[in-house]
């Protein structure tokens, strides 16, 4: 009984081993017999095959792709070995495709067209591409540039999303992670991995309420220093640089009152004796909405440079290039 049991167990084991071997052989056949190593294929052979299947004449096909008749004959020989099929055979009317050749004639042009599209930049970008693209822009810059930018892009990229009031550090992370496509802002340094393009250079201006006592006095640096100033906190998404740190000649009596928003600071300045120093484009927009005067400061702060910023991962993308060009064209138009 034990002997018979051992024989049955051995037979089952042998059958399982045989099935495993058959499965391994079948998998090996699929990997080595039916899945060709693409690295070993010369793409030029497929280009030659496309021409041969179209013209069905070695000489004419060679002329079409700029190769000699002997070179095309050699290519046809290699193709026959690659596909293990004659592909094209002689007849009384010339070359005619085999069934495999007919099959390839139907599929090869679309496959090569896909490859060509992948490696060739498109010269014409559909304006529908703007769908889902995101432009990050701080709130104070939105005041200055969106009235001109949005009409410009309405026809060119109608689906562009604008994300306003975003802190610069978040915008930088968003560019790297792909959540944001472009950012507009002020940056003094070149960050590694990022590209920037200058849009325009602005100068600073003061915002004071109508009837401010300082307007009746001599507008000097000393008098300017005695005024109570408003400033935008460096932690604010509206922050446009530590402007008061860049004014070494200004010995203000007191530190400025910090605000998180240009508009909030401007509203307060319109009802008090605070003076607010902002980029002139921002000052012009704000003074059109609030009872504020725009006055040049009695000293010359460093210019305020506004940049278009993007990550290196998008630098060579043709669609992204198009969008950068359109945004830059809109913001550079009418620049100061």
From Swiss-Prot:
GO MF annotation, one: DNA binding
A Pfam family it matches: LysR_substrate
Transmembrane segments: none
Keywords, alphabetical: Activator, DNA-binding, Nodulation, Transcription, Transcription regulation
InterPro entries, sorted: LysR-type_TF, LysR_subst-bd, SyrM_PBP2, Tscrpt_reg_HTH_LysR, WH-like_DNA-bd_sf, WH_DNA-bd_sf
SUPFAM superfamilies: Periplasmic binding protein-like II, Winged helix' DNA-binding domain
Domain named HTH lysR-type: residues: 41-98
Domain of life: Bacteria
Residue ranges of DNA binding: 58-77
Similarity comment: family membership: Belongs to the LysR transcriptional regulatory family.
Function summary: Acts in trans to stimulate nod gene expression via nodD3 and exo gene expression via SyrA.
Protein name: HTH-type transcriptional regulator SyrM
Gene designation: syrM
């Amino acid at each position: 009984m034990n002997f018979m049991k051992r024989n049955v167990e051995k037979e089952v084991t042998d059958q399982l081993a045989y099935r495993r071997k058959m499965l391994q052989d079948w998998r090996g056949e699929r990997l080595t017999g039916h899945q060709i190593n693409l690295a070993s294929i010369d793409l030029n052979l497929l280009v030659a095959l496309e021409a041969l299947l179209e013209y069905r004449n070695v000489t004419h096909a060679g002329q079409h792709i700029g190769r000699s008749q002997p070179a095309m004959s050699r290519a046809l020989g290699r193709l026959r070995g690659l596909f293990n099929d004659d592909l094209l055979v002689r007849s009384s009317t010339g070359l005619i495709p085999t069934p495999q050749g007919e099959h390839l004639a139907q599929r090869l042009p679309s496959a090569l067209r896909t490859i060509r599209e992948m490696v060739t930049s498109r010269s014409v970008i559909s304006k529908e591409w703007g769908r889902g693209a995101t432009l990050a822009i701080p709130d104070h810059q939105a005041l200055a540039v969106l009235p001109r930018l949005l009409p410009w892009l309405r026809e060119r990229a109608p689906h562009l999303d604008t994300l306003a009031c975003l802190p610069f550090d978040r915008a930088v992370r968003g560019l790297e992670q792909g959540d944001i496509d472009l950012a507009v802002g002020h940056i003094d340094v070149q960050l590694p991995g990022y590209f920037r393009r200058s849009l325009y250079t602005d100068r600073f201006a003061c915002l004071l309420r109508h009837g401010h006592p300082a307007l009746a006095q001599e507008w000097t640096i000393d008098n300017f220093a005695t005024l109570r100033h408003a400033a935008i906190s460096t932690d604010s998404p509206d922050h446009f640089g530590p402007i008061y740190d860049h004014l070494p000649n200004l010995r203000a009596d007191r530190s400025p009152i910090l605000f998180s928003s240009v508009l909030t600071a401007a509203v307060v300045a319109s009802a008090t004796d605070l003076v607010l120093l902002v980029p002139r484009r921002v000052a012009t927009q704000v003074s059109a909405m609030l009872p504020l005067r725009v006055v040049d400061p009695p000293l010359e702060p460093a210019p305020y440079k506004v940049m278009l910023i993007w990550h290196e991962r998008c630098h060579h993308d043709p669609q992204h290039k198009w969008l950068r060009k359109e945004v830059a064209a809109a913001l550079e138009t009418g620049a100061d």
